């Protein structure tokens, strides 16, 4: 560890926030191009030399309060001026992630302007970084999904991709994943101590830069405050989702268990995406208001 940069020499003990905190993730990727390039290289399984340019298309003003448009902290990237990448970190399981991620992908894919030719639509790749297993019956560390013919496996198009990185399944990383150190990047996301960060950071320069940047921004009060706000927000969401599921079970007694739970879960997700936490709390306890919103949103 003697050759390790001095910025982390005195760091020890628990980290204040893990990289699964989406504000911290967004800050680190936006602050350090070396980290962003290394991470994208690992996710796409391509060499860093193949990455000629990376542009964040939805930058935020770091350290300032988020407005409603920025509340969902997905990272939109333009790779080499000809490929759109959307990366999102998600800790909570909404039970609707396939539909939700597909919606995000479709929005990003719809990049044509009036008068553009359809052939010019950018290849688009949505990458979900999850702290839960999407398909427990088919666990994978990193999976990529595309449109193809179910009989002969002919690709319909290579311009439409969905990938999922499961932070709970690092032990299932393939040799290809390990070749691009995606397993170490995943380990960095779930590292709980500075000692863990230092050990992982020795594996490559981008990982070292990531550890340095996490340490540096964690010392900035305005960044810490917003990381804490996001942590509390996620805790509130977890509580509200649990409450909503319990209410959904009650409704399910009369309209069918799965239908009742799914209906309320969809409403809660919709309200959370609009940052309407007060309304989320209300719908879990106010049946009349809940039915009013069901009708309003055709649920």
Language-model features, listed with the residues they occupy:
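Elongated, amphipathic alpha-helical interaction scaffolds
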Residues: 1-299
């Amino acid at each position: 560890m003697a050759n390790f940069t001095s910025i982390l020499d005195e760091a020890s003990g628990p980290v204040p926030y893990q990289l699964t905190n989406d504000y911290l993730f967004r800050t680190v990727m936006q602050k350090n191009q070396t980290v962003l390039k290394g991470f994208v290289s690992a996710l796409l399984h391509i060499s860093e030399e193949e990455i000629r340019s990376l542009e964040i298309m939805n930058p935020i003003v770091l350290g300032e309060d988020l407005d409603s448009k920025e509340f969902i902290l997905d990272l939109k990237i333009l790779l080499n001026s000809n490929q759109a990448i959307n990366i999102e970190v998600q800790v909570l399981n909404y039970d609707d992630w396939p539909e939700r991620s597909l919606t995000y992908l479709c929005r990003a894919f719809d990049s044509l302007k009036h008068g553009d030719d359809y052939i010019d639509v950018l290849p688009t790749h949505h990458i979900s970084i999850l702290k839960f297993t999407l398909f427990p019956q088919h666990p994978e560390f990193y999976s990529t999904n595309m449109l193809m013919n179910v009989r002969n496996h002919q690709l319909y198009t290579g311009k439409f991709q969905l990938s999922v990185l499961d932070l709970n399944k690092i032990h299932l990383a393939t040799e290809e994943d390990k070749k691009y150190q995606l397993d170490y990047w995943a380990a960095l996301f779930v590292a709980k101590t500075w000692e863990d960060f230092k050990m992982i950071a020795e594996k490559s320069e981008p990982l070292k830069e990531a550890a340095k940047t996490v340490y540096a921004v964690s010392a900035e009060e305005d960044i810490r405050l917003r990381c804490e706000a996001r942590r509390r927000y996620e805790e509130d969401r977890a509580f509200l989702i649990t409450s909503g599921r319990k209410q959904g079970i009650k409704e399910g007694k009369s309209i069918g268990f799965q239908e009742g739970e799914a209906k309320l879960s969809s409403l809660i997700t919709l309200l959370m995406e609009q940052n309407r936490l007060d309304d989320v709390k209300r719908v879990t306890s106010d049946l009349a208001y809940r039915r009013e919103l069901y009708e309003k949103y055709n649920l």
